[in-house]
Amino acid sequence: MVSAYSAKSIECHGYNIVRILDGRKKDVNVVINKESHIIVIPHIVKDNFKIYSKIYPVEIKNKTAIFYKAVHKNKDSEYYSDYSNSFTYKIGETKEEECADNKSGSCSRGIHIAHKSWAISFGSSWDNMALLECEVDIKDIVVCKDTDGKVRASKIKVIREIPKEEYYDFK
């Protein structure tokens, strides 16, 4: 264990567990980016899409963003939600769901979507996982203060199922 008061950087090697507290002894949100640098995210700016899109890998096209959803796929090639198997998805279809506009709970009501690696991780223990690429109007996205990469939306358009060969093909 290392105490690094007022440190501007910490270099770690191997397997590390990192807990960061601010001056008030409160946990600080942390993201380790692809270069393995630790980035501290202030609570006050984390809950808007502009900041989210700078922290997490998300593709933006004009006023839409590309997100991913881990779903179950049955033997008839039908896609359904982990939360409710009656909530189904079809390629090319637009799905709508009431979405809570509160930013204090990432698991509140809405269609839960995420950047690709988060979605893959979420469904990785399922034998019947499929990964759907979805297009979402940015205005329909709710980014919560406690996000770890997942967001909620009121409406998504299912573009395609991502082949397993593309799971770790990050652009």
Language-model regions, residue ranges each:
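Short, glycine-biased loop/turn motifs at secondary-structure junctions and
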Residues: 1-171
